Amino acid sequence: MTEQVLETCKAGINAWQQTFNSQDAAGCAEQYAEGTTMVARPFGTFVGREQIQAFWQNIMDQGFADVDYTDVEWTPEGDDGYMLTASWTMNKAYGVVHKEHWKLQNDGRARLEFDEFEVQGER
């Protein structure tokens, strides 16, 4: 079961990355569970899909694109989820994912239940 949960969580982050790289803020927000808290340092804290979608739309409108992940580590979190940590780069910035909690939902997909990341610099 754990390997299946991990593969489902990996499919979730892949879907998020594809929607971001397609400049689809609504698609990005759909990868978050309802009521999720996203801590985006240094920008602030955003709660719920509506606020999260607006944040990503603003980032996209500023020309940020082409996100990629490196140094990805997955740690089991309960029986139905994983914690992800990673480094990330975009065309205009780079940073780290401090903690993403990907958890299986009732529809069988994994979505973010918590997201904390940081922009560490410009490129």
Task: State what each model feature region is.
Residues 1-27, 37-123:
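A beta-strand edge to alpha-helix "cap/lid" segment located at domain peripheries
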